[in-house]
Each structure stands twice: as structure tokens, then as C-alpha cells.
């Protein structure tokens, strides 16, 4: 018999939590969807190399899925700056910025990022996923009766943020300015609109037709939200991304 978690007084019927979770895990295994996390040792060595142990043997692994495109996590200047920051500031603020304030280095970083993208201000999040999710969820929810236009191949973080906003959403074909133009043309002119897309798509390597998409959004009075996650640092004269590379920083509203 399957053991049952005791969640109520003795003798009282209660939900079989163990059974539910056990059946759910078994279903994942049957569908080959149960995720196993590979343990990797990432040492300070020329990338993209890591190490794992298979059948008791330590083996080198080539990591092709890293976002550390320029190897900055191993760069000696970055490592020295990290050591200096740890020695001076410690390992954390001890609380959120709302409660404990914001460290001077974060303020400086946000100013530098704003300048890099040609914007009046910037805000640092804990990850790119959190940034997309939070900004899109908040922005689309706060704009009254906002209508969101989302590229069909947008990252899951963007899709989740838009979903959480509960704003009406229309998905346009991937990187198709003409289709976006047609969809915006039938939207109410005075209604707040947000067009969200990526500049460089991480899943397939596509580069969006930035100039055309931004022109369509502006022509219809829509705000533009451009995810430059995989282009920053790699493209542009100063690493500002594809918007900088194509001279379009001023055309994009939110980066």
C-alpha cells in the first residue's frame, strides 16, 4: 500500500498527497519529460569547457549552450574587479533595495547601462528572465486597456510577463513587419499599444528587421519593447547591441 501523508486528525479522510505527487512524477517519466540536472564542474580554464563524471571517470565537456559569449566570466580584469568588490562591499546587501537601499556600484552600473542604450535611466534585475517577466507584466497591466503585440517566437520570459499582465494580446508572425502593420492598422488609434520582440533570437539565431518593426510601431503610436539580451556586448561599436549597430537606439522606447 502507498504511504499517505497525515494531514488531518486520525480517522479523518484526507487527500492522498503522496499518491498525487507520485503519479505526477510517474507520468513525467512515462512521457520522457522528467528533467535530470547534469552536475558540471566549471573551473577557471579556457572555455567553453566544463567537467563531469560519467561511470566514475572525470571527463571534459564542451559547453555550447552558455551565454558567456565573450568569456567575460573568466576575464582577468573581471575577476580582479570581483575580488575588489568582495573585499570592499562584502557578498550582499542583506536585504532588498527597497528596504536596505541600493549599493553605490549598482547605481553606477545602472547609469552606465542607461548611457550604453541611450536611455535616461536603467534598472538592474536579478536575471534577464526576471527583467522581461517583470517589466512586461507591470507595463502592460498599468497602461489602461493596453493592447500587446507579441512576436510569435518571443522568449518564454516575455510570453509569461505578457500573460501575467492579463492585457489583450495579439501574436504577429515572426519578424513580419507587414503583418504587424496590418494588425496595428485595425486597432483603436487612441488605445495604448505595446509591440514586443527580440533583436537577436537565442533559439534560432534570427536577427529581427529592427528598422522596419520600429517604424511600424511608431507609425501607429505604439511603444516598442526590444529584448537585446543576446546582442549586448557582442554587437555595436561600444557593445550596445544591434540597436546601436544599426543606429536605432533612439527609435526603441524600452530596451
Where are these regions (language model features)?
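Conserved active-site segment immediately N-terminal to the catalytic lysine
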Residues: 221, 240-255
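Active-site phosphate-binding strand-loop segment of PLP-dependent enzymes
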Residues: 68, 170, 174-226
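Substrate-binding/gating loop at the entrance of the active-site cleft, primarily
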Residues: 127, 149-165
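Conserved PLP-anchoring active-site segment centered on the Schiff-base-forming lysine
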Residues: 135-156
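N-terminal "arm"/small-domain region of PLP-dependent enzymes with the aminotransferase-like
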Residues: 13-89, 222, 254
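Short, small-residue-enriched loops and turns at beta-alpha junctions
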Residues: 71-72, 99-103, 156, 177-178, ...
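Conserved N-terminal alpha-helix of the aminotransferase class I/II PLP-enzyme fold
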Residues: 79-127
Amino acid at each position: 500500500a502507498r504511504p499517505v501523508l497525515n494531514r488531518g486528525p486520525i480517522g479523518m479522510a484526507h487527500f492522498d498527497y503522496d499518491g498525487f505527487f507520485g503519479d505526477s512524477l510517474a507520468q513525467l517519466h512515462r512521457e520522457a519529460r522528467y528533467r535530470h540536472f547534469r552536475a558540471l564542474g566549471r573551473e577557471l580554464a579556457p572555455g567553453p569547457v566544463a567537467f563531469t563524471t560519467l561511470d566514475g571517470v572525470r571527463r571534459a565537456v564542451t559547453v555550447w549552450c552558455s551565454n558567456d559569449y565573450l568569456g567575460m566570466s573568466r576575464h582577468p580584469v573581471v575577476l580582479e574587479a570581483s575580488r575588489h568588490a568582495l573585499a570592499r562591499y562584502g557578498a550582499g546587501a542583506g536585504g532588498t533595495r527597497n528596504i536596505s537601499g541600493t549599493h553605490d556600484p549598482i547605481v553606477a552600473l545602472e547609469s552606465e547601462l542607461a548611457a550604453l542604450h541611450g536611455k535616461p535611466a536603467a534598472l538592474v534585475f536579478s536575471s534577464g528572465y526576471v527583467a522581461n517577466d517583470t517589466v512586461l507584466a507591470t507595463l502592460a497591466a498599468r497602461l489602461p486597456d493596453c493592447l500587446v503585440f507579441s512576436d510569435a517566437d518571443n522568449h518564454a520570459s516575455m510570453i509569461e510577463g505578457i500573460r501575467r499582465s492579463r492585457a489583450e494580446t495579439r501574436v504577429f508572425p515572426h519578424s513580419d513587419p507587414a503583418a504587424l502593420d496590418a494588425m496595428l492598422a485595425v486597432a483603436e488609434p487612441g488605445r495604448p499599444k505595446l509591440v514586443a520582440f527580440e533583436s537577436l533570437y537565442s533559439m534560432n539565431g534570427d536577427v529581427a528587421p529592427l528598422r522596419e518593426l520600429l517604424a511600424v510601431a511608431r507609425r501607429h503610436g505604439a511603444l516598442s519593447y526590444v529584448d537585446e539580451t543576446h546582442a549586448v556586448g557582442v554587437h555595436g561599436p561600444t557593445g550596445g547591441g544591434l540597436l546601436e549597430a544599426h543606429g536605432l537606439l533612439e527609435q526603441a522606447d524600452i530596451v
